[in-house]
């Protein structure tokens, strides 16, 4: 284990944040530590407590010129069985292999530390930089995400805040730091479908209507449907059934209804309204007695090659020597809320191989490299 005195400023802050057990939506004073550091170098701080969620918005600079925002979350997912961890989940130690171990190391307290240290250095090196450096931080990303970034963005829009570029510190890298950045995400549309039949005795099927038998052909057709072709930036839209429930538990009772939960991860080639209409048409074709509750988690967004992606790519190349690969794969992130401001959004963070797992860990030295990548991006865009 590396002694604290030997740690870089980024690693010292990362360890401090990891040692705070901020399981969503608890912040455990992580944001207070970040704001203390940012305030010391001249950032204007605006805490935003919304319901049970801590958020903050911070800016440095002037209203003239573009805004580059660092966005992220201080909350982490639960540890799972603590006894399965090699080390205490919130101990934040660097092992003999040089790995920083602890819940949140990759997702995403390491990124938060790199953002803070890079910004401290930038505003000290360029006190009269153009535009503004901003932070949008929440403790509600791993949970429902109702009172976090989404709510803060709504407030920013209401007061006409400008947000040109945003780097979200999600762990985007796959094998090596910076090998992949996320320049967009698919939309997520969920549904809970109820198909109604008529309960009865299995020995008297003519007196019942089995919703399992009735729904099966429609569900099979939905699963086989080709929703779109995707495009140069997005794979084709996917449909997956995640839950299927029916029956009373008794073996001699035809159930009265069936509930199916499914999800679309959709590209920019499809719309919410279009997907909903096609689902309705298939269900009606099979003459089902049905109802459905839809839940939109986020629309797809895409940052095409331009100032932000170019600056991030050049910084990764300059620091690591490798070319990055833009990607829109994976799940949703808070970038979907920020993109509604017309903002160019890129996700760039550590290797994601162990996120949400027991023994979450990243290469400790990657965080100093990530700090330099963030710093170089600031220089390219705002110096």
UniProtKB/Swiss-Prot annotation:
Metal-binding recorded as keyword: yes
Bound cofactor: record note: Binds 2 Zn(2+) or Co(2+) ions per subunit.
One Pfam family per UniProt: M20_dimer
Residues in coiled coil: none
E.C. no: 3.5.1.18
Broad enzyme group: hydrolase
Reaction catalysis annotation: N-succinyl-(2S,6S)-2,6-diaminopimelate + H2O = (2S,6S)-2,6-diaminopimelate + succinate
GO biological process: diaminopimelate biosynthetic process; L-arginine biosynthetic process; lysine biosynthetic process via diaminopimelate
Active site feature: 75, 141
Chain residues that bind Zn(2+) 2: 107, 142, 356
PROSITE patterns per UniProt: ARGE_DAPE_CPG2_2
UniProt superkingdom: Bacteria
Keyword field: Amino-acid biosynthesis, Cobalt, Diaminopimelate biosynthesis, Hydrolase, Lysine biosynthesis, Metal-binding, Zinc
Residue sites binding Zn(2+) 1 per the record: 73, 107, 170
Cofactor(s) named in the record: Zn(2+); Co(2+)
Pathway field: Amino-acid biosynthesis; L-lysine biosynthesis via DAP pathway; LL-2,6-diaminopimelate from (S)-tetrahydrodipicolinate (succinylase route): step 3/3
One Gene Ontology term of the molecular function aspect: succinyl-diaminopimelate desuccinylase activity
Subunit architecture: Homodimer.
Role this protein plays: Catalyzes the hydrolysis of N-succinyl-L,L-diaminopimelic acid (SDAP), forming succinate and LL-2,6-diaminopimelate (DAP), an intermediate involved in the bacterial biosynthesis of lysine and meso-diaminopimelic acid, an essential component of bacterial cell walls.
Name of the protein this chain belongs to: Succinyl-diaminopimelate desuccinylase
Organism encoding this protein: Pseudomonas putida (strain W619)
Annotated gene: dapE
């Amino acid at each position: 284990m590396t002694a604290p005195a030997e740690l870089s400023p980024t690693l010292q802050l990362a360890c401090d944040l990891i040692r705070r057990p901020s399981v969503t939506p608890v912040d455990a004073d992580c944001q207070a530590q970040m704001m203390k550091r940012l305030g010391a170098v001249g950032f204007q701080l605006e805490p935003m407590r919304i319901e049970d969620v801590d958020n903050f918005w911070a800016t440095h600079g002037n209203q003239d010129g573009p805004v580059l925002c660092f966005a992220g979350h201080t909350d982490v997912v639960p540890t799972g069985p603590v006894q399965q961890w090699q080390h205490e989940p919130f101990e934040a130690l660097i092992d003999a292999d040089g790995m920083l171990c602890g819940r949140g190391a990759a997702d995403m307290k390491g990124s938060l530390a790199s953002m803070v240290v890079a910004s401290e250095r930038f505003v000290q090196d360029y006190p009269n930089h153009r535009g503004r450096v901003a932070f949008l931080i929440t403790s509600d990303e791993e949970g429902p995400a109702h009172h976090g970034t989404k709510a803060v963005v709504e407030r920013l829009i209401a007061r006409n805040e400008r947000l040109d570029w945003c780097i979200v510190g999600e762990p985007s890298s796959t094998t090596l730091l910076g090998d992949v950045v996320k320049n967009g995400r698919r939309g997520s549309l969920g549904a809970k479908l109820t198909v109604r039949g008529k309960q009865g005795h299995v020995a008297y099927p003519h007196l019942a209507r089995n919703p399992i038998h009735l729904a099966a052909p429609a569900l099979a057709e939905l699963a086989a449907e080709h929703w779109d072709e995707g495009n140069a930036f997005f794979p084709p839209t996917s449909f997956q059934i995640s839950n299927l429930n029916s029956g009373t538990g008794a073996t001699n009772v035809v159930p009265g209804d069936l509930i199916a939960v499914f999800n679309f991860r959709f590209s920019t080639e499809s719309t919410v309204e279009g997907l909903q209409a096609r689902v309705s048409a298939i269900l009606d074709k099979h003459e089902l007695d049905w109802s459905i509750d839809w839940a939109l988690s986020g629309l797809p967004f895409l940052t095409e090659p331009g100032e932000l992606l170019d600056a991030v790519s050049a910084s990764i190349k300059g620091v690591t020597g490798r070319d990055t690969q833009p990607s829109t794969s994976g799940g949703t992130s808070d970038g979907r809320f920020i993109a509604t401001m017309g903002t160019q959004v890129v996700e760039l963070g550590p290797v994601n191989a162990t996120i949400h797992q027991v023994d979450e860990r990243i290469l400790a030295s990657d965080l100093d490299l990530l700090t330099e990548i963030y710093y170089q991006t600031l220089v390219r865009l705002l110096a």
